[in-house]
Every structure is written in structure tokens, then in C-alpha cells.
């Protein structure tokens, strides 16, 4: 008869957490920054098609690090949730807090019940009418959720990058200043002062999209030429 080995629940959860952390640590970092013009989302990502940043709904965006197939399935599920809720009730009922709660439940269920946890970390951002009304939520592989103030940093070098951002971030930063700060921070432990525009994926949730762009959709993906222009502007 084969001997059954006992593994305590504490050890099982620790092993799952260590497994997920190692997977996330291999991923390139993402920075999400609240600024005067809106919310800037910047990811170290040279791929032009495999996006780590995406639009969820009118004023809500998503950013992730980790395994692409896992966070892409979560992004698509978030879009479906937002569309159904907005259609069934009202567009104003679709909020970053509600979406983050759904993600937290999904991640927590996978972490405790499935064979392996998701190797992902997520950020859900919602731009407000004023900067005080911005919402930034960070979700980890086990379903833990945190309401962040000002900025979110995720990925393998999150602690070092967060120190750089925290040392220079101010609420008064404009979009150009937020982008320049993010690129300096993402260059941590690299032989350059800041990452080139071609090495990153970037997007913005504009604060005054309805008055400036005539649309409720605040999300806009930034092209390399947009990034080049922003990097030459004064912050």
C-alpha cells in the first residue's frame, strides 16, 4: 500500500504563494500613476501586440504582470462583467471597486481550490472628475486587494521601482512628468537613465475626456510618437 504523506494547510498555502511569487518576479514591471491630467499606465513591454495594459470600461483600465494567458483571460472576463452590468443597470454602476471585488473572488478561489494559483498581479484604475476621486486597486495572486494612494508598482523589481516613484511623485505632476518619472523608475538596475519609448507600452485615462474628446471613453493607448513628444515636454 502506498504511504500517504500529510502536508499541513499552512505549508500548502506557503508553497502555493512561493510558486506564484516566483512566477511574478520573472515578469517585467508595470507602473500606474495618478497625475493632474488623469491616470498614466506604463509597462516595460517591447511587444507591440501582447498588451499588459487594456481598457475595461468608460473610465476604467487594467494593467497586469505575470503569465500572459492568465491575466488576459481575467481582462476579458472583466470586460464582459462591465458590459453586462452597464447594460443591465446603468453605466454609472460599473466601478473599479466592483470590478476589483470580482477579480479578488476569482483569484482567491483559484488560489485555494485549483491545482496551481494564477501567477499574476493586477491593477484596476478608475479616473475621477478630480484627482481625489481617482481609484487605484492592486490585487495579488491570492485574492488580496489593496486601495493604493497615488501610484501602483508591480513586477519583479516592485520594491526598488516603488522607492524611486515614491521619492519623486507629486499630485501636481502632469502627464509628461508622470511618464518621465515612470521611465526613470523602470530603468532601475539597468544601464540607462530611463527606458526608451520603444521599450514600453503606455496608455492614459484622461480626466476630462467628455469635454476634451467628446466621449465618455477616457482610455487612450499612446503610440511611440506620443511618448517621444511627452518625453520632450516640461513636467
Swiss-Prot record:
GO biological processes: modification-dependent protein catabolic process; proteasomal protein catabolic process
Localization annotation: Cytoplasm
Pathway note: Protein degradation; proteasomal Pup-dependent pathway
Covalent S-S links between cysteines: none
Key words, A-Z: Cytoplasm, Proteasome
Classification via InterPro entries: Ntn_hydrolases_N, Proteasome_alpha-type, Proteasome_asu_bac, Proteasome_sua/b
Predominant location: cytoplasm
GO annotations of cellular component type: cytoplasm; proteasome core complex, alpha-subunit complex
Assembly description: The 20S proteasome core is composed of 14 alpha and 14 beta subunits that assemble into four stacked heptameric rings, resulting in a barrel-shaped structure. The two inner rings, each composed of seven catalytic beta subunits, are sandwiched by two outer rings, each composed of seven alpha subunits. The catalytic chamber with the active sites is on the inside of the barrel. Has a gated structure, the ends of the cylinder being occluded by the N-termini of the alpha-subunits. Is capped by the proteasome-associated ATPase, ARC.
NCBIfam families attached to this UniProt entry: 20S_bact_alpha
HAMAP family assigned: Proteasome_A_B
Family of the protein in this entry: Belongs to the peptidase T1A family.
Function recorded in the entry: Component of the proteasome core, a large protease complex with broad specificity involved in protein degradation.
Protein name: Proteasome subunit alpha
Organism: Paenarthrobacter aurescens (strain TC1)
This protein's encoding gene: prcA
Amino acid at each position: 500500500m502506498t504511504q500517504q504523506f500529510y502536508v499541513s494547510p499552512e505549508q500548502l498555502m506557503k508553497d502555493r504563494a512561493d510558486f506564484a511569487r516566483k512566477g511574478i518576479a520573472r515578469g517585467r514591471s508595470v507602473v500606474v500613476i495618478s497625475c493632474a491630467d488623469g491616470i498614466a499606465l506604463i509597462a516595460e513591454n517591447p511587444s507591440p501586440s501582447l498588451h499588459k495594459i487594456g481598457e475595461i470600461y468608460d473610465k476604467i483600465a487594467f494593467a497586469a504582470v505575470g503569465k500572459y494567458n492568465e491575466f488576459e483571460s481575467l481582462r476579458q472576463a472583466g470586460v464582459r462583467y462591465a458590459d453586462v452590468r452597464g447594460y443591465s443597470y446603468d453605466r454609472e454602476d460599473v466601478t473599479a471597486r466592483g470590478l476589483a471585488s470580482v477579480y479578488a473572488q476569482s483569484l482567491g478561489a483559484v488560489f485555494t481550490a485549483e491545482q496551481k494559483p494564477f501567477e499574476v498581479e493586477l491593477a484596476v484604475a478608475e479616473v475621477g472628475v478630480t484627482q481625489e476621486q481617482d481609484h487605484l486597486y492592486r490585487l495579488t495572486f491570492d485574492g488580496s486587494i489593496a486601495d493604493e494612494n497615488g501610484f501602483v508598482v508591480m513586477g519583479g523589481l516592485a520594491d526598488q521601482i516603488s522607492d524611486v516613484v515614491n521619492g519623486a511623485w507629486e499630485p501636481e505632476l502632469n502627464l509628461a512628468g508622470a511618464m518621465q518619472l515612470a521611465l526613470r523608475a523602470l530603468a532601475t538596475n539597468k544601464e540607462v537613465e530611463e527606458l526608451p519609448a520603444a521599450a514600453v507600452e503606455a496608455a492614459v485615462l484622461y480626466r476630462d475626456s467628455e469635454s476634451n474628446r467628446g466621449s465618455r471613453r477616457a482610455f487612450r493607448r499612446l503610440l511611440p510618437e506620443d511618448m517621444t513628444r511627452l518625453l520632450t515636454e516640461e513636467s
